[in-house]
């Protein structure tokens, strides 16, 4: 019988492990790879995204990972909002024909963020070799315990339609669908406290 891995709230001493797992998990993400189709540019720019998105998560107890660091999640607590300008240096890695649609895309997604205090799931992903084994669900469940204890809303944007049933099983509801030009869709999703 397979042993159930432990999921923990982790600190910045494990930043590289968590960011590596998430980076691996997004290598085939439809939206992220539409934004960064070139492999080298993906690795370079996604590293910037991981650095910027993980800072507030580590600073505020919003990082969850399994004990082997095959997967992780980055949550931003209520009151934390990243300025999209910090990602501007990565825009040069977006194909020129997609820049305008990508910027429209992010602008439209931003309109779905709840006005109420909420926890924002910026990223959750697993090493692809560990997907489909329930690990993502364990990581999500551990974080949602804290969100529920605080009586807060949880919000995310699903950039991969294959993941939507996972989120729905954990109580998330689809708020809409965002796409521009030939971009893959993203689905903003919200979950009210249980």
Can you say where each PLM-predicted feature lies in the sequence?
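A short beta-loop-alpha structural element at the N-terminal edge
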Residues: 6-20, 24, 28
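Active-site rim helix/loop that mediates acceptor-substrate recognition in acyltransferases
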Residues: 39-62
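Conserved beta-hairpin
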Residues: 58-73
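Conserved acyl-donor/pantetheine-binding loop and adjacent beta-alpha core of acyl/acetyltransferases
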Residues: 72-126, 131, 181
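Conserved GNAT acetyl-CoA-binding A-motif
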Residues: 117-120, 146-159
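Conserved acetyl-CoA-binding loop-helix of GNAT-fold acetyltransferases
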Residues: 126, 132-145, 169
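Conserved active-site alpha-helix within GNAT-family acetyltransferase domains
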Residues: 137, 149-151, 160-177, 181
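C-terminal "cap" of GNAT-fold acetyltransferases
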Residues: 152, 156-161, 180-194
């Amino acid at each position: 019988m397979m042993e159930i891995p432990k999921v923990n709230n982790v600190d910045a001493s494990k930043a590289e492990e968590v960011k590596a797992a998430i980076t691996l998990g997004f290598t085939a993400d439809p939206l992220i790879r539409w934004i960064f189709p070139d492999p080298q540019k993906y690795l370079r720019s996604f590293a910037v995204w991981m650095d910027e998105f993980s800072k507030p998560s580590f600073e505020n107890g919003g990082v969850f990972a399994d004990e082997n660091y095959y997967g992780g999640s980055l949550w931003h607590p209520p009151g934390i909002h990243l300025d999209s300008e910090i990602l501007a240096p990565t825009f040069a890695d977006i194909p020129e024909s997609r820049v305008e649609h990508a910027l429209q895309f992010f602008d439209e997604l931003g309109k779905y963020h709840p006005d109420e205090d909420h926890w924002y799931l910026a990223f959750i992903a697993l090493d692809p070799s560990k997907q489909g084994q329930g690990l993502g669900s364990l990581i999500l469940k551990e974080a949602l315990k804290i969100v529920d204890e605080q009586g807060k809303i949880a919000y995310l944007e699903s950039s991969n339609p294959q993941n939507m049933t996972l989120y729905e099983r954990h109580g998330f509801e689809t708020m809409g669908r965002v796409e521009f030009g030939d971009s893959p869709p993203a689905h903003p999703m919200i979950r009210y406290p249980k």
